[in-house]
Every structure is written in structure tokens, then in C-alpha cells.
Amino acid sequence: MGGEFDATNVILPPEAAIICNIGLDHTEVLGDTLEKIAATKSGIIKPGCDAVIYRETPSVEAVIEARCKEVGAKLHKADFADIRLISHDLTGQVFDWERFHALKLPLLGDHQLHNAAVALTAATVMQQRGWHITDE
């Protein structure tokens, strides 16, 4: 489900926490507003890690920003403006994002491009932390 209830909380210390699109899912556990869900999901952000997030509404981002400030985590927001769709058909879509070109995504929809941008942002952050991740 994510956040403070996520099974990955056993990994200490995490180097990165990734929060994708926050919606009104699992409200009986996570909370009944987007802001409450953001607070619960931001429980995965631990001291000293990098937090990578899907662009959200200002009120949701404020909750996540507060958690990052509280624990000393650096916040990175995926930049959707840098997504350039090259082509799409029934097999998926091809896009450019920042320094990455002609990436093939076998899923359709803008939300899938946004999820890919979050994943690429996380990979870039991990490269900056010294992880060997090639651009391929």
C-alpha cells in the first residue's frame, strides 16, 4: 500500500523513497483525503534519503515537503514538462525525457509517461549517489 505501512520499511537506511501519483485509494487505511494519504505515504521518507515524487497538487506536495524537511531528506519532483512524445501505437509509446532519447514504453497513456519520468528521476538520483546505473 505504501508509506508507513510499506514492507520496504524494513530496509534501513533507504537511499531513496519514491512516491507516485496519490489518489483516493485504500482510504480505510491510508486516510480519507489526499493530504492524509500523502502524510501516510510520506512515512516511507527516512532521514538522509532522497525523495522522488510524482508532481501533485500544491496541498499534497506541501505535506511531502514538510516530511522531507522534518527528516532531512532531499526532495526531487519529476519534471513532466521534459517529456516529448515521439510516437505511439497499440504496442506502446516512444518518448524523450531530458538526456534520454527514444525510450520505448510498452504501455499507453500520459500517466504511464509520468510514471516513467518518476522512475528516470529516481535512477538519476541514484547515479548522483554513486550507484552505477547506465543510461541504457
Question: Residue ranges of each PLM-predicted region?
Answer:
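Short clusters of hydrophobic/aromatic residues that line enzyme substrate/ligand-binding pockets
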Residues: 8, 51, 103
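Switch II (G3) loop of P-loop NTPases
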Residues: 1-4
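Short glycine-biased active-site loop of nucleotidyltransferases that positions the nucleotide triphosphate
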Residues: 6-11, 87
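Acidic, Mg2+-coordinating active-site environments of NTP-dependent enzymes
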Residues: 14-99, 116, 120-136
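A short glycine-threonine-serine/GTX helix/turn-capping micro-motif
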Residues: 104-112
